[in-house]
């Protein structure tokens, strides 16, 4: 892996072509350029022209920046933009947060509940015990179920709690909550 620098506009353009959560920039570019791993680059360099040098060697990925990037990519993705209902955006955000750090997500959801309601559980029945009208839904890609009959403000506060617990920057939390 090599690291290259791109400007914000180009980064946003590439990120907007994300097909699924967790897709790497290399995968996106390969798809956009119709370049497969088996395709060999053609050597059409003019003699006397120096070959391009790599910008920098790949460095260990900073997990904090990586999770921030993943959330930004989600917000820029076509899949997220196509969601017409707040509950569907809510579910996509939860799936992404879980995929970024299972343990931190688990800790955040354990401490998240209302006066009389449990918001997250490992099964539908636990949520239904706290009210038949909770409309539990399974969070895709996770072992969790979540109640969904809350208003958008409550969904935002649930996301805010989880993201704060997972130590996301306040600006990103605000941006994510503003899109639900």
From Swiss-Prot:
Single GO MF annotation: sequence-specific DNA binding
Subcellular location field: Cytoplasm
Keywords: Cytoplasm, DNA replication inhibitor, DNA-binding
GO BP annotations, alphabetical order: negative regulation of DNA-templated DNA replication initiation; regulation of DNA-templated transcription
InterPro entries reported for this sequence: Arc_rbn_hlx_hlx, Ribbon_hlx_hlx, SeqA, SeqA_DNA-bd_C, SeqA_DNA-bd_C_sf, SeqA_N
Segments for region (Interaction with DNA): 86-87, 115-119, 149-155
Subunit structure: Homodimer. Polymerizes to form helical filaments.
Functional description taken from the UniProt entry: Negative regulator of replication initiation, which contributes to regulation of DNA replication and ensures that replication initiation occurs exactly once per chromosome per cell cycle. Binds to pairs of hemimethylated GATC sequences in the oriC region, thus preventing assembly of replication proteins and re-initiation at newly replicated origins. Repression is relieved when the region becomes fully methylated.
Protein name: Negative modulator of initiation of replication
Organism the protein comes from: Salmonella typhimurium (strain LT2 / SGSC1412 / ATCC 700720)
